[in-house]
Amino acid sequence: MFKIGNLELQSRLLLGTGKFENEEVQSKAIEASETNVLTFAVRRMNLYDRNLPNPLANVNLKDFITFPNTAGAKTAQEAIRIAEIANHAGVCDMIKVEVIGDDETLLPDPFETYEACKVLLEKGYTVCPYISNDLVLAQRLEELGVHAVMPLASPIGTGRGINNPLNLSYIIENASVPVIVDAGIGSPKDACHAMELGADGILLNTAISAAKDPVKMAEAMKLGINAGRLSYEAGRIPVKYTAQASSPSEGLGFL
């Protein structure tokens, strides 16, 4: 349906794999979402020790594009090191660059993110940075050569939806690479809204894994994302300040 670098994504829903109650719920939610992209924190995967638990042991990863992230990194060097670990372990070379700058809000550090992206691009990675909804930063990263930008809707795990739709619209309208809205989505309504703004996709985790019924929520998110994309492609009617009748005026003379 759309491409990031040389990778073709069939679904506009990218699914995080953490925080599920158990492997069965995780597996069923993945199936219900119909995603073909699974993202995970490299530090959770125990890539070099098969004796340690693997949180994706029940998933046939050959059926998916695996999308590792650098969660836990606080500096560019840490993010680069995590990406190298994933690459050397044979995981997909598309990397979500996540460098957290504040422990309370979990907002990304723009300076360290930029530096990490610069080095990883030089090393040949497909780079997708997680950023705040900052248009100028998104543009600078595009100029650097990133393959997608991933602006937040609101802080990670808050479920607050899109805090600043105007800024998000600026990023989407000016982007020459795919825009994946990442973090803060709480409901299918939020996901639909982001897609109506023109986002290329949504990355979700907590909104599904922490729902009362993650499997149903995975399906609901899939439908919300599809509806939002269809709405964007169809083109909504313009907002007006005066009423306009939907019925024709012909025939009123008979009244």
UniProtKB/Swiss-Prot annotation:
Catalytic reaction(s) noted: [ThiS sulfur-carrier protein]-C-terminal-Gly-aminoethanethioate + 2-iminoacetate + 1-deoxy-D-xylulose 5-phosphate = [ThiS sulfur-carrier protein]-C-terminal Gly-Gly + 2-[(2R,5Z)-2-carboxy-4-methylthiazol-5(2H)-ylidene]ethyl phosphate + 2 H2O + H(+)
Pathway in which the depicted protein is active: Cofactor biosynthesis; thiamine diphosphate biosynthesis
Binding residues annotated for 1-deoxy-D-xylulose 5-phosphate, in chain numbering: G157, A183, G184, N205, T206
Protein keywords: Cytoplasm, Schiff base, Thiamine biosynthesis, Transferase
Xref: InterPro entries: Aldolase_TIM, Thiazole_synthase_ThiG, ThiG
Active-site residues, Swiss-Prot/TrEMBL: K96 (schiff-base intermediate with dxp)
EC id: 2.8.1.10
GO BP field: thiamine diphosphate biosynthetic process
Quaternary structure annotation from Swiss-Prot or TrEMBL: Homotetramer. Forms heterodimers with either ThiH or ThiS.
Family the entry assigns: Belongs to the ThiG family.
HAMAP family to which the protein is assigned, alphabetical: ThiG
Protein name as it appears in the record: Thiazole synthase
Organism of origin: Staphylococcus epidermidis (strain ATCC 12228 / FDA PCI 1200)
Gene name for this UniProt entry: thiG
